[in-house]
Amino acid sequence: MNRWQRSVVEIQTRKRQVNECERAQVALSKVTACFQQMSTSLGSNVDGSFLREEMEETRTVAHKICSGLHRRLLSLLMEIDQGQEDKEQVERLWVIFLSSLENFQQDLKKVKVLQEIFPLTQRKDRQALVITGLAGGTSEVAARAAMVQTPWLSVEVTVSPDLKTHIEEIDVLLEEMLQRVNVPLWSVEPTQEAWVEGSSTPGVGQEEDESLEEMMEVEVVSQNKTSGCCHHHNCKVGCLLCLLS
């Protein structure tokens, strides 16, 4: 294999690894979101051993994804030279992964505190649960987390630590990531504008207000004549009063 062929193979291998990391980051976001949603039921009337087993399984999946993603991103950042086209993409994944780890660690700390307040080690412990009015369970959320797959989840086996050790491991992981790789957080630029779905062009809001007033317009039929009520453009309160009258 000559130098050109070796270079092509290296580029293809690196792109494949970057794509795997992107898919893993998406998977991690889904799993941690499910874990966070399930944690909101701790201490409520739907809490129980089944919920905590589901959370433990979800935490195990998140730990496997984090371990594999950390190793691959670290390897990529230490191998990629300055100026390579994949460098910005990998650095962006690195920053997103840092943020995801910090958020996940905060959720783990909250879960640890709630499990200490509501231990559920004995039958009488259920008397301390708060009746929040929630119905059903979190099996659907746990099923979504269980369906999440990563490119290396089936071939790499890692032992998931207990909750306390997991929190401590993330501290060590974050410190290692910040020390071994010099990626200034402020130097990483986003690929899309923030709150794109919430932005609007000038004039859109005014058109929406006008259409709302048209929908709220109340027609009064009297003596075979139709007249509009509250036609003034600032008469929103009057429209509501007309509807309530």
UniProtKB/Swiss-Prot annotation:
GO BP: any one term: G protein-coupled receptor signaling pathway
Q: Does the keyword Coiled coil apply?
A: yes
Q: Name one GO cellular component term.
A: neuron projection
Keywords for the protein's UniProt record, in alphabetical order = Coiled coil, Signal transduction inhibitor
Q: Which residues form a coiled coil?
A: 71-92
Q: Which InterPro entries does the entry link to?
A: RGS7BP/RGS9BP
Superkingdom assignment: Eukaryota
Family per record: Belongs to the RGS7BP/RGS9BP family.
Functionally, this protein is described as follows:
Regulator of G protein-coupled receptor (GPCR) signaling. Probably acts by regulating the activity of some 'R7' family protein (RGS6, RGS7, RGS9 and/or RGS11).
Stated name of the protein: Regulator of G-protein signaling 9-binding protein
